Amino acid sequence: MNKPVLVSFLVSGDPNPDATLKFMKTLDKYSGVIELGIPFSDPVADGPTIQAADVRALSNGFKIAKSFEVLKEFRKESNTPVILMTYYNPVYKRGIENFVISAKEAGANGLVIVDLPLQEATEYREICKKHEMGTVFLAAPNTPEDRLKTSDEASTEFLYLISTFGITGARESFEQMTFDFIKRARTTCKGKICVGFGISKGSHAESLIEQGADGVIVGSAFVDIIKNYGDSEEALVKLEELAKELSEGIEKGYEKRK
């Protein structure tokens, strides 16, 4: 991940596992990383768009093993890094080591457990290190300097910068606070920093990359397309159009930085 990249997020099993695989292959053309969300019944960090996607997947009988199967299929055709996003409860229920081994065998490059604070993640980090599984932690605009530094050090893939306070979901534009946060993280962090929450168009990607981000994480905007078009050819066309627009925005932002 040398040039800035698009990190594309999808909810696994929304609306069904076969569709997820098709969506992953479509987004792969423009994505440097794919983030695959494991549906959960109480996704506290997610806004209504992703919550609704979780409900759609779960109501269709989604099981975690299906995420691993989809990823195994994807791995037959692509080496693009895949990060699995989940909450702590499903990991704990399966057993941390069991979950990490299953994810590794399926072809995952890293994990982000949204509601697992760094100070409670010692065992999890040790298990990930043992099985060569990457880790991603989160930081918010109000994260103090020392925590930002330790979160960066604990994140082997990239540090996930939350662009603003609150939950996921598309928004119109970004405040100066977000740009200041990226600059602060750029100064403090030695690893890669990717920005998520609220990014839905090329101009967003351009402005965030221009400020120094290594990647933009886009979820709700893709999930909205899936909500509206379901498992259809039109969904694939719309997903590719948006991914292309975001990718071009990233390129423009990177050019402005030079």
Swiss-Prot record:
Signal peptide: none
Pathway noted in the entry: Amino-acid biosynthesis; L-tryptophan biosynthesis; L-tryptophan from chorismate: step 5/5
Known EC number: 4.2.1.20
Gene Ontology terms for molecular function: tryptophan synthase activity
Gene3D superfamilies the record matches: Aldolase class I (3.20.20.70)
HAMAP family: Trp_synth_alpha
Family indicated by similarity: Belongs to the TrpA family.
Purpose of the protein: The alpha subunit is responsible for the aldol cleavage of indoleglycerol phosphate to indole and glyceraldehyde 3-phosphate.
Protein name per UniProt: Tryptophan synthase alpha chain
Source species: Methanococcus maripaludis (strain C6 / ATCC BAA-1332)
UniProt lineage: Archaea, Methanobacteriati, Methanobacteriota, Methanomada group, Methanococci
